[in-house]
Amino acid sequence: MGLDMYLTKRTYVKNWKHKDDKHSVSVKLNGKKRKDIQEDRISEIIEDVMYWRKANHIHNWFVSNCQGGVDECQEAIVSLDQLKELSALCKKVVDDKNPGLMQTVQGFFFGSTDYDQYYYDMCTETHEVIEKLLKEMEDEPKDVYSATFYYQSSW
């Protein structure tokens, strides 16, 4: 019980007859192709990019910047620009040791509101994961279907 937070990446991979570009997706279990999953029916791949536990300052940022201030455990689209902004802010918080840049928030089992080592560790980890993600995106050809990112929390 408590604040659980998820960032996911969804990549559209549906193959259309009228398109020349084709994705290839294979699902195997113990090296054997899954017969209950038809590759030609796969249209989207969902990746779990990051999971946080009781990082209420990160949650507060998503609520304020991606959810229009509404905190009802709803799923919210997160743009690449927003991810870049969050990454830069997390880095600045750690580099400047300035917790005033990213406020903690109280909530139902949201964890500590102290600006302690866990607070800074979550900022560091968030920055590192987003930077790695942005690098992965940068290396992809610009003409492929782009991914969409989503944030969701539960408690």
Placement of each model-derived feature along the sequence:
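Acidic (Asp/Glu-rich) sequence patches and key acidic residues
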Residues: 1-155
